[in-house]
Amino acid sequence: MTAAVTENNGAGSASAVAGRVVRVIGPVVDVEFPRGAVPELFNALNAEITLPSVAKTLTLEVAQHLGDNLVRTVSMQPTDGLVRGTAVTDSGKPISVPVGDVVKGHVFNALGDCLDTPGLGRDGEQWGIHRKPPAFDQLEGKTEILETGIKVIDLLTPYVKGGKIGLFGGAGVGKTVLIQEMITRIAREFSGTSVFAGVGERTREGTDLHLEMEEMGVLQDTALVFGQMDEPPGTRMRVALSALTMAEYFRDVQGQDVLLFIDNIFRFTQAGSEVSTLLGRMPSAVGYQPTLADEMGELQERITSTRGRSITSLQAIYVPADDYTDPAPATTFAHLDATTELSRPISQMGIYPAVDPLSSTSRILEPGIVGAEHFRVANEVKRILQKYKELQDIIAILGMDELQEEDKVLVGRARRIQKFLGQNFIVAEKFTGEPGSVVPLRDTIEAFDRVCKGEFDHLPEQAFNSCGGLDDVEAAAKKMAGK
């Protein structure tokens, strides 16, 4: 074996030891190194390959030490053209990404390469993507509400500033739209910094998101990191860590409050499952990797608030076949401060966001944190909706006429509440033709208190559809009466 000197990703040059490829199985590559020169776990290795039309550098991440100077690595790019005997050099450090203001307004891949401006950030500061979570004595003990202006969220499943929020739902119920709405609201209302991680989702969605953010003028405050559906599992497994590293810099060095959006955390788990099988690990329940809980914990424990600064994470979580007992969503539940469950039946009723008010939860929905009035109104809304749910079987079999008079009143009130929990989104303006509404929390509590007391039972149910505040409801009712 020979020693070589290699460029260290634009961060200066370092002595790098050369190994050689001994086996290639899809994205998993075994590499042999000289005795005493075996690279550390998570180090990035570089392999130069030449295809008929182009020469390129593959990045391999060390995943296992096999013994006899062999390491098993996972490739971050397709391994087409990689053959046994190809020289591999150790960079001496983990995969590193650019950090700081330079990443705002740009699109990166999991390796930290800028996709819209090639080479951007490589001559500046870079951080490795494998980092330890903040020390226990550095964590923030204070609990604050993150006000979103979305009624159903602020009232029934309030988000924690510096917390972890899960958006659960099957395919097509509105997870990505809700994330796009949150990015827009945070940028417009709070002038905050956002980092978006596209993990294993459709390339088209990434393009749409970039164009929409550009149109709305919020791109300059957001860093986008993509490892999409067509990427190898190694990239999909690491892209969330790359985005989180950028967010940590804004929190720890610049002292900013950051929002980290991950779409979709299920694809992170799925990529880990693919890699685990190729690495020869025995599968666990439903075919998932045996290290599922550890991998999820390593990611989630880094998303937290430190003294005076926070990373608030909003994670879209695809639920396979709408089965919440699947190990992927079930493992994520343990780390979350709030869960927003998107319901297909509510979506089919045309109520957006299609949040299920009865199954969505928040650990801060208690009087000591949100206040006695907020807690009382939220519980009254849930009580009315729960009673309506219990009566639905009777209504379906016998009809409304068989209900007692007080139950008829309650059903009408519940339907008004159900419709009033929806509202127009800013990102949907071009589709609906209606301006998006931002409702202050104080107004939300007062409005639902009045609706629960029956002050608006005389207005038609349809007047409550996609309205912001009660003024919008009354205006819609007058318009309907005029027709």
UniProtKB/Swiss-Prot annotation:
Location relative to the cell: Cell membrane
Cited InterPro entries: AAA+_ATPase (IPR003593), ATP-synt_VA_C (IPR055190), ATP_synth_F1_bsu (IPR005722), ATPase_alpha/beta_chains (IPR050053), ATPase_F1/V1/A1_a/bsu_N (IPR004100), ATPase_F1/V1/A1_a/bsu_N_sf (IPR036121), ATPase_F1/V1/A1_a/bsu_nucl-bd (IPR000194), ATPase_F1/V1_b/a_C (IPR024034)
Pfam families cross-referenced by the UniProt entry: ATP-synt_ab (PF00006), ATP-synt_ab_N (PF02874), ATP-synt_VA_C (PF22919)
SMART domains noted in UniProt: AAA
Leading EC class: translocase
GO molecular function: ATP binding; ATP hydrolysis activity; proton-transporting ATP synthase activity, rotational mechanism
Main location: membrane
E.C. numbers: 7.1.2.2
Catalytic activity: ATP + H2O + 4 H(+)(in) = ADP + phosphate + 5 H(+)(out)
Keywords: ATP synthesis, ATP-binding, Cell membrane, CF(1), Hydrogen ion transport, Ion transport, Membrane, Nucleotide-binding, Translocase, Transport
Record-listed ATP binding positions: G169, G170, A171, G172, V173, G174, K175, T176
Record-level GO cellular component terms: plasma membrane; proton-transporting ATP synthase complex
Membrane topology classification: Peripheral membrane protein
Quaternary context: F-type ATPases have 2 components, CF(1) - the catalytic core - and CF(0) - the membrane proton channel. CF(1) has five subunits: alpha(3), beta(3), gamma(1), delta(1), epsilon(1). CF(0) has three main subunits: a(1), b(2) and c(9-12). The alpha and beta chains form an alternating ring which encloses part of the gamma chain. CF(1) is attached to CF(0) by a central stalk formed by the gamma and epsilon chains, while a peripheral stalk is formed by the delta and b chains.
Biological role: Produces ATP from ADP in the presence of a proton gradient across the membrane. The catalytic sites are hosted primarily by the beta subunits.
PANTHER family, sorted: ATP SYNTHASE, ATP SYNTHASE SUBUNIT BETA, MITOCHONDRIAL
Family: Belongs to the ATPase alpha/beta chains family.
UniProt name for this protein: ATP synthase subunit beta
Originating organism: Rhodococcus erythropolis (strain PR4 / NBRC 100887)
